[in-house]
Amino acid sequence: MRCVPVFIILLLLIPSAPSAAVQPKTEKDDVPLASFHDSAMRILSRQCCPTIPECCRVG
């Protein structure tokens, strides 16, 4: 019976713990995705085959 108050206190503390999903989004988080997309488009346009021009028009 001595563990019941400790268990209740722990249950009350769990919702107040900070979550990783609550962290604010910064501008630095967007940069890698944008540069990744640009790099992918550059690679696709570079590897375009001359016999099939439709493969060049991606995006």
Swiss-Prot record:
Disulfide bonds: none annotated. Belongs to the conotoxin T superfamily. The cysteine framework is V (CC-CC). It is found in: Secreted. The modification Pyrrolidone carboxylic acid is found at residue 47. One of its GO terms (cellular component) is extracellular region. Expressed by the venom duct. Residues 1-22 form the signal peptide. Contains 2 disulfide bonds that can be either 'C1-C3, C2-C4' or 'C1-C4, C2-C3', since these disulfide connectivities have been observed for conotoxins with cysteine framework V (for examples, see AC P0DQQ7 and AC P81755). It comes from the Eukaryota. This is Conotoxin ViVB. The modification Valine amide is found at residue 58. It comes from Conus virgo (Virgin cone). One of its GO terms (molecular function) is toxin activity. The keyword Secreted applies. Its main location: secreted. Residues 23-46 form a propeptide.
